[in-house]
Amino acid sequence: AFCNLRRCELSCRSLGLLGKCIGEECKCVPH
């Protein structure tokens, strides 16, 4: 599956984290 950066950012933001696409994976990382 292709990582959608916008969707990744939105889902991570709700956790108070920053969304990053690593390859095809969405990773939530601290700011």
Curated annotation (Swiss-Prot):
Task: Name where it's found.
Answer: Secreted
**Region annotated [R/K]XCQ motif, chain positions:** 6-9
Q: Which cysteines are joined by disulfide bonds?
A: C3-C21, C8-C26, C12-C28
Give the record's GO CC terms: extracellular region
Modified positions (Histidine amide) are H31
Record key words, sorted? Amidation, Calcium-activated potassium channel impairing toxin, Disulfide bond, Ion channel impairing toxin, Neurotoxin, Potassium channel impairing toxin, Secreted, Toxin
Which InterPro entries would you find in this protein's record? Scorpion_toxin-like_sf, Scorpion_toxinS_K_inh
Q: Name one Pfam family in it.
A: Toxin_2
Q: In which tissues is it expressed?
A: Expressed by the venom gland.
**Keyword set includes Disulfide bond:** yes
Query: Which top-level group of life is the source organism from?
Result: Eukaryota
Q: Name one GO molecular function term.
A: ion channel inhibitor activity
Give yes or no: UniProt keyword Lipid metabolism: no
Provide the family line: Belongs to the short scorpion toxin superfamily. Potassium channel inhibitor family. Alpha-KTx 05 subfamily.
Quote the function comment for this protein. Blocks small conductance calcium-activated potassium channels.
Q: Domain text from the record?
A: Has the structural arrangement of an alpha-helix connected to antiparallel beta-sheets by disulfide bonds (CS-alpha/beta).
> What name goes with this protein?
Potassium channel toxin alpha-KTx 5.5
